[in-house]
């Protein structure tokens, strides 16, 4: 998807990279940053977001019809493995087709941050500056372990059938268990404790505060939200605590909009991420090849892609600076702390893209 206009010189492109379960519709998950006068200024930038391979929201994935014909079935578990690097190379071909000559900035968090770092290797003459947030230079053993636990939950569902399930009877329980596990890595202990504690809660109150909506065309990434709002009731006799109700509701909301084989494909993709692969002997050497001005955004309470990992990136990239998103909400803070993000991004863009930021609207 795109917003704004491509400049006559085709050099004002801003690429936004989505996270694991997001889509190309930036307005659904980073909406407060998109628009005139905001970080993703549509009066000045041609803002572009493209879906990753394996995502159910576009490009190609396990839910893609074979030969474009669903009567022949869909790829399902036979969908080939893809990497972060594959996505970036594919997206570069799209920009080439559009006649883009130069990318002004690439911005993304989590899985999107991995894409951002890969974009940098096209060189500073093509990509002018980058902003990786809450991400890593390579998938850590810690993150690989969490991904495997989630895949195991899906594969343990009797309806998974080695990935040969039908759309009419998918392995919902396995996907919901995977989502619950993931949600706990996206938040922090203090965040959940502050929000729920040992509250058993009033069911109606819990519905109003935590159930909110299911997005019918849904694309929120880790946090809840979305454009279409459909009220949902949630009632489980064994939901004694508000934290349980929250996890079960969010898992159900996710299973209504996502596919299990896609989830497996995308989490496997994360595990392939390694900037040094095929390039250098070490991660530090690979990062040292990134020459663009780089704003690394980290979150001290992030237990999935830790602040230490952001510090590693900032130390090794020659022209990088690290800024902290202040929040106790964990990994998801990069999707929540919009005012901080807007301020940090606008400052960085003014510093490194004055020719675009200071000119009149297109």
Curated annotation (Swiss-Prot):
Q: Which reactions are catalysed by this chain?
A: L-homoserine + acetyl-CoA = O-acetyl-L-homoserine + CoA
Which E.C. number(s) belong to this protein?
2.3.1.31
Q: Which residues form the AB hydrolase-1 domain?
A: 12-335
Keywords of this entry: Transferase
The record's region (Disordered) falls at: 195-232
A single Gene Ontology MF term assigned here is:
homoserine O-acetyltransferase activity
Q: Where is the composition biased (Polar residues)?
A: 208-222
GO BP field? homoserine metabolic process; methionine biosynthetic process
Q: How is it used?
A: Fusaric acid is phytotoxic to plants such as cotton and banana. It has been shown to induce programmed cell death in plants. In addition to a mild toxicity to animals, fusaric acid exhibits acanthamoebicidal, antioomycete, and antimycobacterial activities.
Q: Where is the active site?
A: 110 (nucleophile), 302, 331
Which pathway or pathways does this protein act in? Mycotoxin biosynthesis
The answer to whether UniProt assigns keyword Transferase to this entry is yes
Protein task: Homoserine O-acetyltransferase; part of the gene cluster that mediates the biosynthesis of fusaric acid, a mycotoxin with low to moderate toxicity to animals and humans, but with high phytotoxic properties. L-aspartate is suggested as fusaric acid amino acid precursor that is activated and further processed to O-acetyl-L-homoserine by cluster enzymes aspartate kinase FUB3 and homoserine O-acetyltransferase FUB5, as well as enzymes of the primary metabolism.
Entries under PANTHER family matching the protein: HOMOSERINE O-ACETYLTRANSFERASE (PTHR32268:SF11)
**Which HAMAP family does this UniProt record tie to the protein?**
MetX_acyltransf (MF_00296)
Family, per the entry? Belongs to the AB hydrolase superfamily. MetX family.
Q: What is this protein called?
A: Homoserine O-acetyltransferase FUB5
Lineage, opening ranks: Eukaryota, Fungi, Dikarya, Ascomycota, Pezizomycotina
- Gene name, per UniProt, is FUB5
């Amino acid at each position: 998807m795109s917003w704004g206009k491509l400049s006559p010189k085709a050099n004002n492109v801003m690429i936004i990279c989505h996270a694991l379960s997001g889509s190309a519709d930036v307005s659904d998950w980073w909406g407060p940053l998109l628009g005139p006068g905001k970080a993703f200024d549509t009066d000045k930038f041609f803002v572009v977001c493209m879906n990753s391979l394996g995502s159910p929201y576009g490009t190609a994935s396990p839910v893609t019809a074979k030969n474009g014909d669903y009567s022949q079935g869909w790829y399902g578990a036979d969908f080939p493995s893809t990497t972060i690097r594959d996505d970036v190379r594919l997206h570069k071909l799209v920009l080439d087709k559009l006649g883009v000559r130069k990318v002004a900035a690439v911005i993304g968090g989590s899985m999107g941050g991995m894409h951002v770092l890969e974009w940098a290797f096209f060189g500073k003459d093509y990509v002018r500056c980058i902003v990786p947030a809450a991400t890593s230079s390579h998938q850590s053993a810690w993150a690989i372990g969490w991904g495997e636990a989630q895949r195991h939950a899906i594969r343990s569902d009797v309806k998974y059938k080695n990935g040969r399930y039908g759309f009419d009877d998918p392995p919902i329980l396995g996907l919901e268990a995977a989502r619950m596990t993931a949600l706990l890595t996206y938040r922090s202990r203090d965040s959940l404790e502050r929000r729920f504690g040992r509250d058993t809660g009033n069911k109606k109150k819990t519905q109003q505060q935590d159930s909110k909506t299911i997005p019918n065309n849904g694309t929120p990434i880790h946090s809840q939200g979305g454009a279409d709002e459909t009220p949902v009731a949630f009632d489980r006799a064994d939901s004694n605590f508000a934290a349980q109700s929250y996890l079960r509701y969010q898992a159900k909301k996710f299973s209504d909009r996502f596919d299990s084989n896609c989830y497996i494909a995308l989490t496997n993709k994360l595990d392939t991420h390694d900037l040094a692969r095929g390039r250098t002997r070490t991660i530090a050497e690979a990062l040292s090849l990134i020459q663009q001005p780089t704003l690394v955004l980290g979150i001290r309470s992030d237990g999935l892609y830790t602040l230490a990992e952001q510090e590693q990136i900032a130390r090794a990239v020659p022209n990088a600076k690290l800024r902290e998103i202040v929040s106790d909400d964990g990994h998801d803070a990069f999707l929540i702390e919009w005012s901080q993000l807007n301020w940090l991004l606008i400052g960085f863009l003014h510093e490194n893209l004055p020719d675009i930021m200071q000119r009149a609207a297109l």
